[in-house]
Amino acid sequence: MTVQLLPLPAEHFDDWRASTKERLIRLRQDSGLLPGQDAVEDAERNFTELLPEGVDTRTSRILRIVDDEGQERGTVWFAFKDGRMFLIDAAFDEPMTDEQLDELWELVLGIAAEELVTQISARLFVQDAEARRFLDGHGFSTSSIQMLLQPIPDRDVSAVDVSPMTAERYPSFAAASEAGFASELAASGRLTPDEAAAESHRQFEHELPDGLDTPGQKLFTASVDGAEVGILWLAIRERDDHPHAFILDIEVAAGQRRRGYGRALMHAAEREARRSGADSIGLHVFGFNQGAVDLYEQLGYRRLAELLVLDV
């Protein structure tokens, strides 16, 4: 049984929007990425930002998956920007055969060629088995992973001394952190080096507009016997109306690695998060950093969602 992709008729848009919004909310909530009202607001932003003109938005395509008997089998929603194609949602009414999924993928590649895109990306939630079946085997790489630890355990931090970063240390930290994030963004395959540098600068200015005095931002240095061994940067945010800590940067100094300081810094992050009243702590890790992924999973962090990328 073959499949084809057909544009969503305008008269079906409202029903599609309602069911897709419900699905996006559920994916965020069930994965743990965003709980409660946070998931509702994030899903709503997708429609506001990506479909400002509804079904007529030129930078999005909403397509029905139809079999050769004329039965709708699901929908896919793509957004396009700067030569990239983003799979926002793939909803299957029932499981499809491997052959049908392969046919569907060939149709997707045809759309990519029509739109002259150079990259396809997709956010994959951990529990979305059908979307994973659809994307598996086509050469995607994992650009980044969102992870969460909840509740926050009370673990020993005695291996390192952690203290607030000084004003004297901040400038060199800021330069190294911004440059390091740009390098990792480019290495993840998501952005070109120039795009990565611009995005890193934008995020740094957004998070730390007032440097060390920025509310909700906590920066630390870690030392052993008076020698600096690493840095830690935490943002205190809200998650479902509760304080939530997010690790924005954590790094063991060159020459101090493979001595257990990375694990000790993670324990310190948990302690500082608890001191700020947080009951959960999250992080983002690039997919190529398998050593960090392994450490976080050993510490009890669980995967919530992955960003997949494919150059075409």
Identify the role of each PLM range:
Residues 1-35, 148-168:
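Conserved N-terminal entry element of GNAT/NAT acetyltransferase domains
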Residues 11, 18-23, 28, 35-88, ...:
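Acetyl-CoA-dependent GNAT
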Residues 80, 92-95, 253-255, 259, ...:
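Active-site acidic-Proline motif in GNAT/NAT acetyltransferases
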Residues 96-107, 256, 260-268:
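Conserved acetyl-CoA pyrophosphate-binding loop and the N-cap/start of the following alpha-helix
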Residues 108-112, 247, 268-269, 273, ...:
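Short hydrophobic clusters on alpha-helical segments that form packing/core surfaces
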Residues 112-125, 274-284:
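Conserved GNAT acetyl-CoA-binding A-motif
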Residues 122-131, 283-292, 309-312:
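Conserved beta-strand-loop-alpha-helix junction that forms the acyl-donor binding cleft
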Residues 135, 140, 296, 301:
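Conserved active-site tyrosine of GNAT-family acetyltransferases
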